[in-house]
Amino acid sequence: MHTTTQATPQKSMVMTTTNGGGVDPPQWPEEEEDEDAAAGSSCRVTAANGHHHHHQQLVVSGELGGGGGGGGGGREKEDDELKRKWAAIERLPTADRLRLSLLSSTRGGGSSGDVSEGGGGGAASSELEVVDVRWLGAAERRAVVQRLVADVKHDHVRMLRKQRERMERVGVRPATVEVRWRDVCVEAECQVVSGKPLPTLWNAALSRFSLLAAKLGFSHHQSKVQILENVSGIIKPSRITLLLGPPGCGKTTLLKALAGRLNKSLKETGEIEYNGVKLDEFVPAKTSAYVSQYDLHVADMTVRETLDFSARFQGVGSRAEIMKAVIKREKEAGITPDPDIDAYMKAISMEGLQRSMQTDYIMKIMGLDKCADVKVGNAMRRGISGGEMKRLTTGEMIVGPCKVLLMDEISTGLDSSTTFQIVSCLQQLAHISEYTILVSLLQPAPETYDLFDDIIIMGEGKVVYHGPKNLIMTFFESCGFKCPERKGPADFLQEVLSKKDQQQYWSRSEQWYNFITVDQFCDKFKASQVGQSLAEDLSKLYEKSKANKNALSCSIYSLSKWHLLKACFDRELLLMKRNAFLHITKAVQLGLLAIITGTVFFRTHKNFDIVSANYYMGSLFYALILLMVNGIPELVMSISRLPVFYKHRDHYLYPGWAYAIPAFILKIPASLVAALSWTSISYYLIGYTPEAPRYFRQLLVLFLVHTGALSLYRCVGSYCQTIAVGPIAATMSLLVILLFGGFLIPRPSMPNWLKWGFWLSPLSYAEIGLTGNEFLAPRWLKITISGVTIGRRILIDRGLDFSVYFYWISVAALIGFILLYNIGFAIGLTIKQSPGASQAIISNDKIRICHGRDQEKSKDIKIGTRRMALPFTPLTISFQDVNYYVDTPPEMRKKGYMGRKLQLLRNITGAFQPGILSALMGVTGAGKTTLLDVLAGRKTGGVIEGDIRIGGYPKVQQTFSRISGYCEQNDVHSPQITVGESVAYSAWLRLPAEIDTKTRKEFVDEVLEIIELDEIRDALVGTPGVNGLSREQRKRLTIAVELVSNPSIVFMDEPTSGLDARAAAIAMRAVKNVAETGRTVVCTIHQPSIEIFEAFDELMLIKRGGELIYAGPLGQHSCKVIQYFQSIPGVPKIKDNYNPSTWMLEVTSTSMEAQLGVDFAQIYTGSSIRKDKDELIKGFSMPPPGTSDLHFPTRFPQKFLEQFKACLWKQFLSHWRTPSYNLVRIVFMAFSSIIFGVLYWQQGNIRHINDQQGLFTILGCMYGITIFTGINNSQSAMPFVAVERSVMYRERFAGMYSPWAYSFAQVAMEIPYVLMLALLFMLIAYPTIGYAWTAAKFCWFFYTMFCTLLYFVYFGMLIVSITPNLQVASIYASSFYMTQHLLSGFVMPPSQIPKWWIWLYYISPMSWTLNLLFTTQFGFEDNSNILVFGETKPIAAFVRDYFGFHRELLPLSAIILAAYPVLFAILYGYSISRFNFQKR
């Protein structure tokens, strides 16, 4: 009998360790393997390669071949067949049995996977075939998982029970882990400042000096803040525990502490043990899986690839050893297992597989199977939804073998039914597979809450309760608090700790209520029976004898070094393919520049004299700097991937060296292509020596230079870590390398005490290799007047006169630098902590609050006593037959969907009315956000059909943005301004001009108070996941920023997503108040509690596919919705106290539709509710009598000047508080000025210039100063502008300002900083280099530097505004820099530039910079003579004749130079008004 199964080309490593995890195996005879082999001599399984290496044929002979033909049926015959084939497998050696299994294959009726032909007649019949689980194809893996878990809700528990029963039948138990912790304290050290604790330039500078002072022994004001305070507890195997508490109470810190992942800057005391073993005695990161609340993934990888690589790196743990023990005992007992369970268990026990069946299983239970082949995406690139991203974050960690799961806020962005399903699966893993699970959730619905066994309540860094769920309400009742009947228990438990909410739950009406603090609750808990029981359990030592030796991991990595490296290679290769566009763009860019360069230097200089030699020298230097700059995009790409790398590294998926080696080796072909594309085009165009060996030697050096540049930028990125600092550090490194490289300043001209620097620059060796290769050729052997050859003369002048063999020394040195950079890269990846872990800054006031939490003064805000009283017009929004189409994604076309357009919304009809709070609900991916975007006019692509009316009149987008507010799901805010400033800024620009400043300020204060942001109004917003506000604070800020605009219509996309129950209640109270003022409020909502859901007046429910299935009133206690759906035959009735929103989503799910055989959309279309709604909408579609269409005299609420002032105010604050941008470029300018001053000490003095080389050297100085400080300013401006761009998109959609006002403010804000940078240079470098110390020349130099730095900054802003992301912007920017370099008049004087390129010289801003600098310094020196190319000339005449710089044209040159920053600023304003790269 023959079977053929699909196989991946990657073979796996099979573990053969004996006596394995979680088992107590009997003593097997040592010769058992030989007996197996002997017994199996009549039943042979061999692998024979077919015609294609992706297929493997298993040849099974002996008894397995019997019984293959014939018809017949009956269960007995099938069982006999199974036993006979299984018996044949049992005769094989253990190593073969571990990988072979029986899988069903349908013959005659089609099959999933390849099956052999023959037998069985024509009818379809299912037969078992022997397969090697290592080589299962994608279809076969999916088929196995589908058979085991066809319906997650019912089949998952059965599958786990089958696995458990199989193991129990042979006495094998899974490894279990108990986690306990005693008196754990965690504290952070903060630097204390006076006033607001903001990272301004001043505070940042003081912080650096204070840290330096501390290292030198001087004291500075530090304070300790307690995060966790004496917390103790136990989480046991087979139990799932819920962790609850308000934001900032220490939940995340506790989870990280238990997982052994606390930041090293935090001080931790106390004991944490796994099975009685302390954390430092094993590897907790490999024993437990910590699921972060932040979603960090590689945007270019698909969901399946992300999970496959995670599964591969995490390994199989003790599964292989457990499987080995199971099959041995089954053989001894004569047990035949279920084929599918056997195949699954064996497949997930195979180490190092490229594609894992565990991935298919995790995707199934997490609901990710439908988007398995979709790229993850990010904020600027379309990908999976936010809910799917959150599930992927969870799946990525639990796909591994860890039996301890520590999960932080895994339900954010998920609807309540999806959360319930995921937690159900986790509960089953705990109860059946004996996992130990601790989960932190924000707003668990009652039915999700009921799935947990134990509850931990935290407050202010302390444990308020830790014990069984069924005793927690008794505990709080003993404290005097009772949960109301229709209140979710989780909501009650979080609110009962809050000073503002506690009183409403006081149940002892006969006693006077007093606020009970967290400390009082803790004391009551310790005195309670549950608290005493916990203390008793903790006092008992864990019995290590009952612990399984394989329960804890003692190895840091799951794979061998070779397999780690290979897996990282596969991943890097995949990402290179996905980013092929970037690599192709870079190669094309180099090719085009090679053509331009070749035609600029095009064989016009065939005299082979000293002048031509200078041109050839210039072309070689240009090639070197071009290849160095061409690598800059590598820096941006490396830094952008670091957050994901740090996550994986901290989970011990792979080490830094395994990431660094593939990043280096796989870029070698890219460097080879770059060097080839340059050399092949430019070599003969420029006219280098036409000898093949010299061509290949030049190619080799340029290849090594490009490889070294990429390696250097990766190394710099690994230490600088952020996109703000990285480009500046890279430019600084490039500057040092070029200054000591021997071209800008020849080695003989360097100060003697700095000449050693020449030998530390890789560019020096590249120049030695290239120039020696060219100028030692026979054609340069003509003897000059000085008695040496022309080739030797040019080399001597440049200090590059070395013997021929130095070429190979140079090659060896370049290889050494490449290795050095890559070793540095690997070390940087290994030792550097992820960014965001810097020292915290805190104010004196905040310190006092933190040290006395319970004394914190708190105002009792009675929400609703003050109303948002500014005048507005109540408006109804109605819409009929709204459809929305997008282009079909490529992934769907690959799967066979042939339509060009994909419909996301289908004939949606409805209306939202003033004073009525409407909920828009549906499962994840139903189209809720899409509908809001369509109604709000936020879509940037796709086709919209249908009629949308505002107050009966057709919607006009410009007018609509004035009277509406949109709270987006993603909380996008400027990171460097405070909460209060964000809200004030929104009010300034969005409230009508007639509202005076005092009223506006009062309104802002009122909104901050209502949303409970007044206590953190001075807190910096910060960057999500790095610093600043927490997730729930950002969400409340998003709501406040929109409410402060006093809108008539408010759209809110997931206003409670990411909030805990109390924060969600605060937000919804505020939203309800807004609706009660007569405004129209619409919210999409995922997982509302009963209380939040029933706060709504009307509901619009959309099913997957964008079809409406209900639109109408909720009714008292949701009675109208319940009544409607229960009237549909077959729909199950709602249970008592069940959350109506969860029930509604469950009974309208796709699976329920299939089960009932109905279409809820069709039922709704034919219902009386729909007919009533249609009549209502008809009325709303007609303008009420006596009304007129909305009209505003101006497009924006404020006049242009006011918009400009507001934007300038915000830009001022952002610049002042971004030291990573401004402080770093100030430091760079100071560093550059010092190094130029030292290297060119007094070489600009006219008395020290004797020949043309002296002039060329000082021109190189001017060129180097301008190009490097310019590039640095441009590169550092790009990430700063990119961060603000996403905020600008939101503000522009809201109609806050004209793009011109925004751009002019951003442009204007750069001027004082650029003035400061230019002045800094003039004070340090100008006198040290020795330029003429006259007022006129000083002012001209200052003016030129200022304009140059300004146009470079504005160019950086412009290039970001016309490109989709920083990587592409970097590539285009590097093209600009290199074109400037080539045609600025430095590499080749304008008189020698061919006429077909001279126009580029005249439009190049750098050419005017050099013109002004050189002319003002040396163009008036008529009385100073120098020796130039063998003749004596006045400096002024040489400047005019050789460079074409005419002093008469100085005023014109100054005007043209000033025009460039103006031009770039205008183009920037135009670009941000025209281009939008946000895909919605």
From Swiss-Prot:
The chain crosses the membrane at residues 581-601, 619-639, 656-676, 699-719, 725-745, 811-831, 1226-1246, 1254-1274, 1311-1331, 1340-1360, 1368-1388, 1396-1416, 1449-1469. Residues 1-42, 60-81, 104-124 are annotated as: Disordered. It is a multi-pass membrane protein. ATP 2 binds at G922, V923, T924, G925, A926, G927, K928, T929. It is found in: Membrane. Keywords: ATP-binding, Membrane, Nucleotide-binding, Repeat, Transmembrane, Transmembrane helix, Transport. CDD domains: ABCG_PDR_domain2. Residues 1-18 have a biased composition (Polar residues). Residues 63-73, 107-123 have a biased composition (Gly residues). It comes from the Eukaryota. PROSITE patterns: ABC_TRANSPORTER_2. Disulfide bonds: none annotated. ATP 1 binds at G245, P246, P247, G248, C249, G250, K251, T252. GO terms for molecular function: ABC-type transporter activity; ATP binding; ATP hydrolysis activity. InterPro entries: AAA+_ATPase (IPR003593), ABC2_TM (IPR013525), ABC_transporter-like_ATP-bd (IPR003439), ABCG_dom (IPR043926), ABCG_PDR_2 (IPR034003), P-loop_NTPase (IPR027417), PDR_assoc (IPR013581). Its main location: membrane. One of its GO terms (cellular component) is plasma membrane. Pfam families: ABC2_membrane (PF01061), ABC2_membrane_7 (PF19055), ABC_tran (PF00005), PDR_assoc (PF08370). Residues 212-485, 877-1129 form the ABC transporter domain. Signal peptide: none annotated. Residues 563-775, 1202-1418 form the ABC transmembrane type-2 domain. May be a general defense protein. Belongs to the ABC transporter superfamily. ABCG family. PDR (TC 3.A.1.205) subfamily. This is ABC transporter G family member 49. It comes from Oryza sativa subsp. japonica.
